[in-house]
Amino acid sequence: MSSSAPIGVFDSGLGGISVARQIAKDMPAEHVLYFGDSANAPYGIKTPEQVRALSFDIVERFVRQGVKAVVIACNTATSAAVNDLREHYDIPIIGMEPALKVACDRGDVPSDPHHIPQRVIVAATPLTLRERKFAKLMDRFDSNNTIFKEPCPDLVEIVESGRLGDHDLVMRTLHGYFDQYDMEHIDSVVLGCTHFVFYRDYFRELLPERAAVIDGNEGTVRHLGVVLESLGKLAPEDATGGVELANSDPSERIAELSRKLLNV
């Protein structure tokens, strides 16, 4: 596989565009093929078997296009399908997971040998939070921290329907999920769905200034770079990169919204 081959990136819909955008920013020589499966969104309320089948269809499409790696820019699809995909294909398959370690590590202060327990909300889809993969992740950190799981399926739908700019709707939806918490005593919110990255500024309105809003995009893209470099597959520095957008929903509305989110 040539180092100039493209990277395939996919999501249940439009959220993974935030990951494609991060690749374009951090690895500008890379050519990205993005596929959003908006016709089948949301994945977060489907069964693991349904998500696996959809994920295999998309990766097969990428393989036919000659990609050198695939990024599953979807926490839900990662939870349901990443292990099976890695067993089936001989190209790197990079998954996502909620950046819980980053959130909990904020309790480790160099000047203090004792961990300061963190109060963390993980906002994600229902399926991500139900899957064994997330349970194992929680097991690593919940003994020294307080971790709240908050499924937020409506946040996916708001992005997919193009209503992200409706401030009243978004804040009303966020308050519906998060007013049950004493936000003044929350240390961070982990955005465990790539759709939710587009809500960062809204979460900032909800949280005290000292609290962090954390997503896994930068870490995922950094890992992608390390993997490609180890295989000698990074694109030449003088290559012209970019992002090509495709979607299972062929409507102009989705195409226009995809372009808009890529350039936010």
From Swiss-Prot:
What GO MF terms are annotated? glutamate racemase activity
**Pathway noted in the entry:** Cell wall biogenesis; peptidoglycan biosynthesis
Quick one: which residues bind substrate? Answer: D11, S12, Y43, G44, N75, T76, T194, H195
User: By its UniProt entry, which Pfam families does this protein fall under?
Assistant: Asp_Glu_race
Q: Which residues form the active site?
A: C74 (proton donor/acceptor), C193 (proton donor/acceptor)
Q: Which UniProt keywords are given for this protein, alphabetically ordered? A: Cell shape, Cell wall biogenesis/degradation, Isomerase, Peptidoglycan synthesis
Q: Which reaction does it catalyse?
A: L-glutamate = D-glutamate
Instruction: Kindly list the biological process annotations in GO that this record carries.
Output: cell wall organization; peptidoglycan biosynthetic process; regulation of cell shape
Q: What class of enzyme is it?
A: isomerase
Look up the EC number in the record and give it: 5.1.1.3
Q: What does this protein do?
A: Provides the (R)-glutamate required for cell wall biosynthesis.
User: Which family does the UniProt entry place this protein in?
Assistant: Belongs to the aspartate/glutamate racemases family.
Q: What is this protein called?
A: Glutamate racemase
**Which organism's genome codes for this protein?**
Bifidobacterium longum (strain NCC 2705)
Gene coding for it: murI
